[in-house]
Amino acid sequence: MGKRAFGALFLAILVTAPAWAEQPRSPFPPIEVSDLAGQTYPLRNLLGAATVLNFWATWCGPCRVELPELQKLSNELGGKGLVVLAVDVDLPPISEEGVAQQLEFIRPRIQTFLSRTGITLPVYLIDGKTQAVLGVDRIPFSVLLDGEGGVVRIYPGYSPESTRDLRQQVLGVLAERPKQGGK
């Protein structure tokens, strides 16, 4: 790309950025999540001023690296409105027996993982059908939501760079809070 073309592109982005920034964000689909006791909650009831949904599994190597970093982020910014939800995707599509019987198998693995790693993030579960509907086709898979449940950014996979970017995006969403009337 030539210097003029690059300059024109940069100028176009600069001029349109304020208009783009004011566009409403796409809402995250209305889903329900289950806690480790089998209680079901609408996701919208769990949102903070900024919410990170981290889809993970106990057997996922990159998840084992990313979750402690998200725990640190939660420890740092939780008092400022950040909520980090660890959403385990070990459940297969819910069968007729429902979540309760499947939880009996999965719960001990999750609890062992949490105790070994010191992770204290709230853990919720979704089943394989919900995972497919959401398009979570790899893990870890993180989604940053604003206080209204709008999708700010999606992070498929893990890298140190994506974690740094996530932190910056979270700070940006938290800084927007007064403009949104606070939450």
Predicted regions located by residue number:
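Conserved redox-active cysteine motifs that mediate thiol-disulfide chemistry
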Residues: 55-72
